[in-house]
């Protein structure tokens, strides 16, 4: 919907939201009703939370009804992730900080297919096993994030780069899955455009983060 040639009236949908609209269009073509699509809304709400898109317009509606599914009848994979949360009713903020990081951790540390297996599993026992593995990935992600951020800050200090207008750091063994998080941490610390590099095969991989009014993409 952000394409200039797209006439759809709401342009803040995340990728999953666009996918849901496709499913909705297919359902209408097959004379199905919105009731047939409710089972997907826990995933849509999770994606809205994970992508930090604005909770306005259609996102607000999708998030509201998605949260109702999460709090009443979530799919086994989501249920397995939240069953130890000591809250009776989860909000979109809870999904941002509890559900989304765990799903993202699979792709950051191992492979995104593990998260796909979790959210498409119908057997609760198997889903709980997948959730346990993903919980370990999330713990590993936190530890890597902490360690690499520490190393990056030390590198800046050792190179006397505390007062530069930008941050560029590199270490060949930094885990590619967390350098984006590390870049965000460095922006929080120095508030300046930041690029974190690591080695990926025979090439370099990097994540960039910036500050308000400074576009590192264009």
Regions found by a protein language model. Give the residues of each.
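Hydrophobic, small-residue-rich alpha-helical packing segments that form membrane-like cores
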Residues: 1-18, 28, 35-36
């Amino acid at each position: 919907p952000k394409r200039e040639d797209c006439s759809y009236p709401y342009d803040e949908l995340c990728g999953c939201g666009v996918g849901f609209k496709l499913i909705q269009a297919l359902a209408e073509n097959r004379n199905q009703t919105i009731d047939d699509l409710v089972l997907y809304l826990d995933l849509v709400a999770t994606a809205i939370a994970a992508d930090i898109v604005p909770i306005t317009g259609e996102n607000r509606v999708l998030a509201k009804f998605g949260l109702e599914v999460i709090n009443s009848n979530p799919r086994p994979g989501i249920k397995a992730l939240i069953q130890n949360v000591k809250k009776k009713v989860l909000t979109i903020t809870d999904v941002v900080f509890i559900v989304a990081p765990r799903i993202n951790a699979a792709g950051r540390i191992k492979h995104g297919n593990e998260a796909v297996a979790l959210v498409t599993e119908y057997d609760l026992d198997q889903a709980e096993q997948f959730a346990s593995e993903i919980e370990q990935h999330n713990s590993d992600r936190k530890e890597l994030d902490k360690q690499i951020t520490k190393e990056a800050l030390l590198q800046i200090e050792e190179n006397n780069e505390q007062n530069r207008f930008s941050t560029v750091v590199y270490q060949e063994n930094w885990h590619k899955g967390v350098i984006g998080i590390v870049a965000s941490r460095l922006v929080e610390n120095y508030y300046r455009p930041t690029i974190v590099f690591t080695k990926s095969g025979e090439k370099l991989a990097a994540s960039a983060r910036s500050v308000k009014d400074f576009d590192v993409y264009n």
